[in-house]
Amino acid sequence: MKQKIIKVGNIDVANDRPFVLFGGMNVLESRDMAMRVVETYVEATTALNIPYVFKASFDKANRSSIHSYRGPGLEEGLRIFEEIKNTFNVPIITDVHEPSQAAPVAEVVDVIQLPAFLSRQTDLVKAMAETNAVINVKKAQFLAPHEMKHIITKFNEAGNDNIILCERGSCFGYNNLVVDMLGFSTMKETGYPVIFDVTHSLQKPGARSDSADGRRSQVVQLGLAGMSQGIAGLFLESHPDPANAKCDGPCALPLHQLKAFLSQMKQMDELAKSFDIIDTE
């Protein structure tokens, strides 16, 4: 299968190109923290020559508790995103949860993300497709890798071919996720770029009284395993103080470890893509 190249600004995203980092923070906690996080990412990716797209959510609409922090909301979130783009000249990815959010978000950011829990919602898919933006499709925890073709078809038939696929783990019993490494090659067979959300794959959903737990201590091992599959990109969330993060702190990479972590991911990506392809059919 010929591998498609999806353009995000001036960045080529493809399974046979050097990996692209989609990284930042889980949710916008404040303007100042967002600026600090993106500055750290820009410094690290520039030093390592890694193409970079900033990630953050303006609203976490699927929290375990109604009392949990959700974010600044659409209007303030887009204002912060505009400031980040103007200051750092980086593309941005963020998620939408309702059809009405797709158009205004697509006017500001470069990639709009279809959340895993909502990946089969046809009205949301159609609204996102109609923006003509690049779409990052999170694979739902309850879907098999080969079922992503149905979501791709929905987007295609709604007029959008600018698609990236994202692995984020699969349900393994209660309160646990696992990543099936065979799923990467299955999704790559579509020709679309595949990226790996290592952060959310470390989640233990519902494992705490009112929020998800996580396994941050294993982020390097899981990241290297994913990058060994020769994929288009890595999706990563970091935090200056994970223990006090307002969402998914147990999964977040400590911000001060970012450059060292990315250095290892880049080495694995380069190694994986240096091998000759062996046809075992």
UniProtKB/Swiss-Prot annotation:
Catalysed reaction equations from the record: D-arabinose 5-phosphate + phosphoenolpyruvate + H2O = 3-deoxy-alpha-D-manno-2-octulosonate-8-phosphate + phosphate
Protein name: 2-dehydro-3-deoxyphosphooctonate aldolase
Annotated pathway: Carbohydrate biosynthesis; 3-deoxy-D-manno-octulosonate biosynthesis; 3-deoxy-D-manno-octulosonate from D-ribulose 5-phosphate: step 2/3; Bacterial outer membrane biogenesis; lipopolysaccharide biosynthesis
Keywords assigned by UniProt, alphabetized: Cytoplasm, Lipopolysaccharide biosynthesis, Transferase
Family assignment from sequence similarity: Belongs to the KdsA family.
Signal peptide: none
UniProt cross-references to InterPro entries, sorted A to Z: Aldolase_TIM, DAHP1/KDSA, KDO8P_synthase
Any one Gene Ontology cellular component term annotated for this protein: cytoplasm
Location in the cell: Cytoplasm
Organism expressing this protein natively: Psychromonas ingrahamii (strain DSM 17664 / CCUG 51855 / 37)
Major localization class: cytoplasm
Keyword Ribosomal protein applies: no
Enzyme's top EC category: transferase
Any single GO BP term: keto-3-deoxy-D-manno-octulosonic acid biosynthetic process
Organismal lineage: Bacteria, Pseudomonadati, Pseudomonadota, Gammaproteobacteria, Alteromonadales
Single annotated GO MF: 3-deoxy-8-phosphooctulonate synthase activity
Superkingdom of origin: Bacteria
PANTHER family per the UniProt record, alphabetical: PHOSPHO-2-DEHYDRO-3-DEOXYHEPTONATE ALDOLASE
